[in-house]
Amino acid sequence: MRVLFVASEASPFIKTGGLGDVAGALPKALAQKNADVRVVIPKYKEISWEVRDKLRFVKWFNVKVGWREQFCGVWECFHNGVTYYVLDNEAYFKRDEVYGFYDDAERFAFFDRAVLDMLRQIDWQPDLIHCNDWQTGMLPVLLKFEYKRNDMFYWKMKCVYSIHNIAFQGVFDPQILPELFGFDMELYNNTCLKFDDGVSYMKGGLCYSDVITTVSNTYAYEIQTPEYGQRLDGVLRERSYALRGITNGIDYDEFNPKTDKFIKKNYSINSIEDKAINKTELQKELGLTVDKNIPMLAMVTRLTSQKGMDLLVNISDKLLQENVQLVILGTGDKHYEEHFKWLDSRYGNKVSANIKFDNGLANKIYAACDMFLMPSLFEPCGLGQLIALRYGSIPIVRETGGLKDTITAYNEYTGEGNGFSFRNYNSDELYNIIEYALWIYKDKGKWENLIENAMNSDNSWNRSAQIYLDLYRELTGQD
């Protein structure tokens, strides 16, 4: 099975969000199942030094972007059992940020075409191309309407398109079709790419891929409704026969409390008592009251309304009247940043607001906290709750998307469950479930049972990778 995994980012090369984690971990897990999987990403200015020195120049060629020919260099390296191709064009990708430029339409039009041209240049024929999010949405369109029509080399290639977050759709002026792709306006006029008065790259991927996947079963259902579908729900209902939900995993080598180099004391399910050492150490580091018995609640997240920040803001004063500690790590909307800074100054040794992104501190928080808050408005899959489970920190989540699929509400009578959940997007429900969790926390026997349930949850990529591999085989007709 030969698979080309196409993404705009992949850990450890470059990562801005969950897509980077998936593109780093899923191919690795597929390779461990003997798939010939290769990954292709752009060569950004900020590619990690960890892998930059491994890159080897392969060749260069020109890529047609509208009426122009643009340089494309191919670099290659082998990492974690996977071959990575990194496509180089300094005019498009040697910039201080990854996304958010006026010419993003052109940048990823170049990338999508360059990926297909590269396959011919290196003479490698994948059975299947797996595209991800809007940045690669035009690749299935190019494959169907140009490359398969003009070159038998591409004839048998199938396309899978994965939605990681449907809120980002890549909508641009329709004139890009003739100017960047050389298409006439038929694809716009027949509405397959049309979104309002623009062209949506994501809609192209949805309409012209062979199979659509998304990152959890519940999210696959949700995005077919007007509430969550971001006005693409109609397309998804039409193609529901081709839509699959496959829950993401996490890399158990990267997130492992037994080997984590960032935390004070490594521990496992057989030494849960050592988790408290990480808690007191973090309390010292952040200037909180040092007491292993005070319940510590934490969030490692973007500070945006999608992540349920307004719910926490509404109850924060009331919550902090309790004997609890609150630790926040992340950046986002200014008014949320300012609110948590204010809480930090007002409540001193009960609150630590860390308005930054720090991987090392994130791991310390996962290892130290007792409860991990994810009251999201919507959450395609969510990685935070999976990491928290791995570290024995109990998630408190809203029942949406992947949170609903991965967190089973604790039942104090049967001892089953790995977290706490609430249904409606409501501050009172969040407060009430936190109060219930704090009540269970007082019973050390029940709490230790809950920690064991959490750490025994299987959220590795091994399980999800097998589901993807079965899907690939079904699609390509291979055993």
UniProtKB/Swiss-Prot annotation:
- Recite the UniProt keywords alphabetically: Glycogen biosynthesis, Glycosyltransferase, Transferase
Instruction: Tell me the residue numbers annotated for binding ADP-alpha-D-glucose.
Output: 15
Annotated GO molecular function terms are: alpha-1,4-glucan glucosyltransferase (ADP-glucose donor) activity; alpha-1,4-glucan glucosyltransferase (UDP-glucose donor) activity
Q: Which reaction does it catalyse?
A: [(1->4)-alpha-D-glucosyl](n) + ADP-alpha-D-glucose = [(1->4)-alpha-D-glucosyl](n+1) + ADP + H(+)
Instruction: Write down the superkingdom of origin.
Output: Bacteria
Q: Which SUPFAM superfamilies match?
A: UDP-Glycosyltransferase/glycogen phosphorylase
- Gene3D superfamilies per record: Glycogen Phosphorylase B
**Classification via Pfam families:** Glyco_transf_5 (PF08323), Glycos_transf_1 (PF00534)
Its pathway is:
Glycan biosynthesis; glycogen biosynthesis
EC code = 2.4.1.21
Name the PANTHER family on file. ALPHA AMYLASE DOMAIN-CONTAINING PROTEIN (PTHR45825:SF11), GRANULE-BOUND STARCH SYNTHASE 1, CHLOROPLASTIC/AMYLOPLASTIC (PTHR45825)
Function, as annotated: Synthesizes alpha-1,4-glucan chains using ADP-glucose.
Q: What's the name of the protein?
A: Glycogen synthase
Its gene? glgA
